[in-house]
């Protein structure tokens, strides 16, 4: 049975990073850099969010020679909807990939 509780601070951080470019497939190492989360925290979060249906996951179709294929992730339609609701509840503005997250100003 799945618990229905709000995402943790780490999950929210990951979701907000993914929401900057929701259609883009991202690999774990890239996400560790952008979120600041350690791999031991990030990969279980990715698995949990995928199990909830908030993320889509797939293996890289072709990997460069000398490197194994990466597991790629992106927000699902449900995940994007839930992330936007979470951002609104936390008064966070999701900016483009190049920008950082920032709290909304009162009256904005």
Describe every region a protein language model picked out:
Residues 21-24, 51-52, 78-81:
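Short, charged/polar surface micro-motifs in flexible loops or helix N-caps
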Residues 30, 59-61, 77:
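Short, well-ordered turn and helix-capping elements at secondary-structure junctions
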Residues 69:
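Exposed loop/turn and edge beta-strand positions of beta-sandwich/beta-sheet ligand-binding modules
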